[in-house]
């Protein structure tokens, strides 16, 4: 994959990858002055990295304090700790670049492991946004590798998994609307390209390889849709549905004429002619704003026209009609490129993307968009926009209700997986898609993927029985894709964006072969108190212990809930305040589910330093993140993670609720079979401030709930246990350290617990 740096004679045997990478590292040191680092600086970095397995800095500190030489030296230490670097050279087998492979793991259980972390990272955002919005460069990426937390190899907990946001060029500033399968120019490091002639694609490949050698698995977002006029849609028009808006408009105009004929005795003739003219004109552009007198006729016309619109649109989506339009699109694409249709096969053949798009729009040819999260059937053409620049569609759910107000996906192009008129699967498109995903994963050597936008594929909104009825990717396609990827790579892990609606866990796990489900933390942050989390763990345990369940599935715990696109959710973690955010992290690390309910945690770059805004803007605009410089928050965040990774009870035990009161007081324990020790946690589970949603009389109201201090609480410890110590955060050591706890009896008293304050103790069986 990286031999691009070194030209070889045709007969020369391919170099071992470790030799290649050693040469690449040497060249990187040359251009980045990697030798300009003092022995004292080396000793400092070596001591810290060897102690922790990584450099415990927030990314903003790494950006401001580490130069390229520091970064490369630090990574050498980290690679050495991962047994892939010795005597200033890489040393590994070509089939063991992935840390999962090096660990000897031949299944996907590694990503499900309790205490395993998954960090969402946007490469473009890794620059210093506090200084400039310019995207991060290659050295900035490497600084992130250096600071990523390690795991616990003795417990088979791998180091933090990198979850990469799509790095393709995009439309409308949205990472989930790729305009091609290439690499965005915002990700490319021009300096590295100029010095070593490394393309953007090769830079990303090199970063992923370096990450895996540093112990970090890498997964990637996979999309079941593409951009409206992406290169792949132009190269292979048959993978999408298409409309000819000119033909649709002509057909609707005829229907308008027929309906108007029935108005001869119902309305004034001149009024009807005015309304007819407006109705026809607005199909192409302009506004339908008019006075109340005309509006009555117009609304009557629109009501009678609606079923005709549906029929006209549905007819155009029939298999034979789609074939005709696809053939026209192919002819136009070939004509613009001055070639024949048989010469256009891949994205590389699309060299005049803009010209092709303009010509297609001129001819009235548009790929068909998705719809609303709950829409079914085909989109119904309504009209062109007021400016006449793009088509507008109405969307309906499976009951026929208009759900257009939820349609935020009109700018994407779903793949043409199924003929909705009869449920027939479009096998060529399915095979194309599966091979595309497989090739992408092979190109970048991913250890897993996360499937986007699949949270309703098996409920009544998207299928009737087993027959797909919406634009969403069908479960049968997901099953085929996932099983293919797992056959290619036994340790390959697959995450589903499924938020547990409809209780469809078995379909995602047993039928579609997913390993981890997204969970509902995004929409239910305010409900996730310790009691509810433990209840969630128990539900997962019950499923995994069922007789028909083969293997296990996991449900992700999501620390970050940034979902600003949907303001009705609006569950940003920063709203909890610093202490509230720390307690949220603590809950995810100190409420383990036990052997049959293991759950990893996902967080977003910036969370660890209490960066509360900006992530979504960076993902869309491909700019660097403005980061908070809250080192104290980071140090506590990091200390909680390290403690939980090392402790036998948090890695292997199971949390059980002792008591949870409405005033905010909660107590739970973590126990393990055959272990004489238990952890006991007491806390005030209310955050200092939090948005909550109250539903009453069919309406939902969002309010700000302020947490209150809990006074005079106590808990009785069973007589067979003795309270021996309390773990208290040491600001000097930046660790939770064990301190002897002197207690005359077996009652723990708490005079006061502030909102989100937590305490934890070790109890030993007497």
Show which residues each predicted segment covers.
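Aromatic- and carboxylate-lined catalytic core of secreted/periplasmic carbohydrate-active enzymes
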Residues: 589-595, 607, 614-661
């Amino acid at each position: 994959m990286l031999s691009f740096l070194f030209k070889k004679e045709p007969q020369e045997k391919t170099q071992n990858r470790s030799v290649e990478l050693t040469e690449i590292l040497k060249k990187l040191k040359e251009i980045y002055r990697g030798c300009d680092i003092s022995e004292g600086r080396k000793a400092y970095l070596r001591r810290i990295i060897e102690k922790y397995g990584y450099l415990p800095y927030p990314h903003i500190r790494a950006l401001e304090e580490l130069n390229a030489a520091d970064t490369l030296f630090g990574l050498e230490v980290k690679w050495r700790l991962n047994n892939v670097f010795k005597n200033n050279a890489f040393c590994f087998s070509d089939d063991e670049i992935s840390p999962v492979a090096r660990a000897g793991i031949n299944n996907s259980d590694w990503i499900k492991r309790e205490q395993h972390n998954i960090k969402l990272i946007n490469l473009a955002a890794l620059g210093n946004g506090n200084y400039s919005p310019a995207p991060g460069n290659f050295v900035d990426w490497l600084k992130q590798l250096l600071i990523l937390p390690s795991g616990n190899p003795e417990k088979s907990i791998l180091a933090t998994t990198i979850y990469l946001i799509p790095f393709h060029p995009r439309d409308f500033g949205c990472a989930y609307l790729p305009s091609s399968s290439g690499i965005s120019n915002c990700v490319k490091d021009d300096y590295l390209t100029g010095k070593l002639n490394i393309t953007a694609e090769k830079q990303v490949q090199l970063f992923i390889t370096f990450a895996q050698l540093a112990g970090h698995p890498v997964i990637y977002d996979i999309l079941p849709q593409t951009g409206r006029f992406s290169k792949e849609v132009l190269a292979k028009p048959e993978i999408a549905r298409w409309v000819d808006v000119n033909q649709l408009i002509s057909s609707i105009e005829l229907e308008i004429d027929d309906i108007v004929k029935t108005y001869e005795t119902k309305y004034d003739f001149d009024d009807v002619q005015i309304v007819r003219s407006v109705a026809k004109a607005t199909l192409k552009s302009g506004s339908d704003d008019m006075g109340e007198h005309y509006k009555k006729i117009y609304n009557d016309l629109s009501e009678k026209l609606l079923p005709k619109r549906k029929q006209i649109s549905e007819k155009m989506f029939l298999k034979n009609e789609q074939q005709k339009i696809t053939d026209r699109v192919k002819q136009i694409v070939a004509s613009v490129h001055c070639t024949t249709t048989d010469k256009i096969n891949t994205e590389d053949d699309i060299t005049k993307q803009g010209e092709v798009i303009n010509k297609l729009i001129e001819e009235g040819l548009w790929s068909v968009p998705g719809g609303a999260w709950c829409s079914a059937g085909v989109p119904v053409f309504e009209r062109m926009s007021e400016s006449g620049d793009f088509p507008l569609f109405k969307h309906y759910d499976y009951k026929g209700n208009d759900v257009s107000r939820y349609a935020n996906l009109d700018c994407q192009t779903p793949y043409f997986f199924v003929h909705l008129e009869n449920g027939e699967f479009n096998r060529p498109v399915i095979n194309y898609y599966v091979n595309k995903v497989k090739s992408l994963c092979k190109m970048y050597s991913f250890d897993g993927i996360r499937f986007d936008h699949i949270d309703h594929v098996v409920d009544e909104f998207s299928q009737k029985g087993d027959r797909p009825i919406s634009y969403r990717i069908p479960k049968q396609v997901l099953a085929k894709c996932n099983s293919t990827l797992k056959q290619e790579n036994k340790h390959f892990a697959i995450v589903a964006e499924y938020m547990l609606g409809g209780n469809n866990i078995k379909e995602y796990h047993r039928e579609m072969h997913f390993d981890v489900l997204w969970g509902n933390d995004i929409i239910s942050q305010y409900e996730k108190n310790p009691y509810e989390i433990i209840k969630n763990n128990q539900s997962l345990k019950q499923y995994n212990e069922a007789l028909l369940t083969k293997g296990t599935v996991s449900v992700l715990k999501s620390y970050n809930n940034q979902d600003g696109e949907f303001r009705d959710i609006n569950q940003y973690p920063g709203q909890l305040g610093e202490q509230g955010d720390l307690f949220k992290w603590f809950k995810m690390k100190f409420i383990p589910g036990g052997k049959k309910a293991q759950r990893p945690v996902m967080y977003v770059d910036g969370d660890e330093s209490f960066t509360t805004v900006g992530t979504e803007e960076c993902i869309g605009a491909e700019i660097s993140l403005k980061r908070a410089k809250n080192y104290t928050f980071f140090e506590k965040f990091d200390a909680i993670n390290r403690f939980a990774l090392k402790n036998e009870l948090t890695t292997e035990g199971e949390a059980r609720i002792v008591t949870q009161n409405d005033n905010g007081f909660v107590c739970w324990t973590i126990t393990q079979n055959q272990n004489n020790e238990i952890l006991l946690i007491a806390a005030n589970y209310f955050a200092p401030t939090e948005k909550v949603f109250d539903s009453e009389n069919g309406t939902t109201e969002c309010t700000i709930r302020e947490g209150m201090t809990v006074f005079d609480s106590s808990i009785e410890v069973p007589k067979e246990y003795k309270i021996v110590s309390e773990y208290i955060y040491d600001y000097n050591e930046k660790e939770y350290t064990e301190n002897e706890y002197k207690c005359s009896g077996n009652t723990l008293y708490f005079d006061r617990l502030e909102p989100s304050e937590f305490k934890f103790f070790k109890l030993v069986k007497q």
